[in-house]
Design a protein with these regions (language model features):
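Acidic-enriched and Gly/Ser
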Residues: 1-188
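A generic structural signal for residues embedded in beta-strands
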Residues: 33, 227-229
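Intrinsically disordered, low-complexity linker and terminal regions at domain boundaries
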Residues: 259-305
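Conserved glycine-centered short motifs in functionally critical loops
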Residues: 157-159, 163-227, 234-237
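Short beta-strand segments
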Residues: 14-16, 40-42, 232-234, 257-260
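Basic/aromatic-rich interaction segments and small domains that mediate binding to polyanionic partners
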Residues: 240-260
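Mixed-charge, low-complexity intrinsically disordered segments
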Residues: 237-238, 272
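Short, basic/aromatic beta-hairpin or loop at an interaction surface
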Residues: 1-15, 194-207, 253-255
């Protein structure tokens, strides 16, 4: 077992482990640590604890020091400097006539590097832009191309649910999502209904997937023939996944039919087989394209791994 603390460098960012060393550090404090891109100012989100050795990437770096008042002030000044750096970079992009969208400027704590995050369709030759920026800032410059999901994570926003975006509030990593999840949850397969503000399949499709898989496994499909606890046979007309209730058109003795509602546990039926929703070709193509784009972009490009 290894003693560590967990540190984040941005809202909803990936959590990195560091050795607390001689310091006693509590959750909510700030620390100065050495990272792959230099000395950084981080927020402690996991207090001291022991984790299994295989969960720690070696060599495990130790905390340089808990953040001082001077460190806090320096970090605040860096955030102000980033606003000016953003404006300057926008001007330089326009000057060089580059087809790229600047998303964020970020200083490392020690000012050893300025990172500029951007989105673009395809590859961009920004070598001359880097030289121009280096002559202005007199420090190392890194331009990092990110995807539209990273853009949403950085900028934030409000989802169709009316709540702040999942990726910008609590998700440290993007989760793989697929059309299958929308089908499993019986959601509308209209691409505009299940796409987030980033234009990709909504990350929240993953949130309830395991629950829906378990609940759906206990239900028949619409159209299945079932036997009820009171010895009646009938055809399933609708199901309520969360309530675990099933409406059945039962056959009565006098050749009449009647719609009755039962608990899923009151029915006997064959093991469920997947019945996919019928989709028009246009919607199916759009959904498949969204799924391909999500897989292509993969993990976040904001993190320094």
């Amino acid at each position: 077992m290894t003693k560590v603390i967990g540190v984040r460098f941005r809202q909803a960012g990936k959590i990195y482990f560091f050795a607390p060393g001689k310091y006693h550090i509590e959750e909510g404090e700030h620390v100065i640590v050495e990272t792959a891109r230099g000395v950084e100012y981080g927020h402690v989100v996991l207090s001291e604890r022991e984790v299994e050795d295989d969960k720690v990437i070696q060599p495990l770096k130790a905390v340089i020091r808990p953040a001082t008042v001077e460190d806090d002030e320096r970090e605040a000044k860096n955030r102000e400097k980033e606003k000016e750096a953003y404006k300057i970079c926008l001007e330089k992009i326009a000057k060089h006539k580059l087809d790229m969208k600047l998303i964020q400027a970020e200083y490392t704590f020690d000012n050893n590097k300025v990172l500029f995050y951007f989105t673009a369709d395809g590859r961009i030759d920004f070598r001359e832009l880097v030289k121009d920026l280096a002559s202005v800032f007199k420090t190392r410059i890194e331009l990092r191309q990110i995807g539209v999901r990273d853009e949403a994570k950085i900028r934030g926003g409000i989802g169709v649910c009316g709540r702040p975006l999942c990726c910008a509030t609590y998700m440290p990593e993007f989760v793989p999502v697929s059309i299958k999840m929308a089908k499993e949850q019986n959601l509308s397969l209209n691409p505009t209904k299940i796409s987030g503000v980033c234009g990709r399949l909504m990350c929240c499709l993953k949130n309830e997937q395991d629950t829906y898989e378990e609940l759906n496994s206990k239900l028949p499909n619409v159209g299945d023939i079932v036997t009820t606890f009171d010895k009646l046979k009938g055809e399933v007309s609708s199901v309520s996944v969360l309530r675990q209730r099933v409406k059945v058109i039962v056959n009565l003795d006098n050749d009449e039919k009647e719609v009755r509602e039962y608990a899923a546990s009151e029915l006997r039926f064959k093991p469920k087989k997947r019945v996919d929703k019928a989709l028009d070709k246009k919607s199916l193509k759009e959904l498949e394209e969204l799924e391909k784009l999500e897989k292509k972009e993969g993990k976040s490009h904001i993190n320094d791994d």
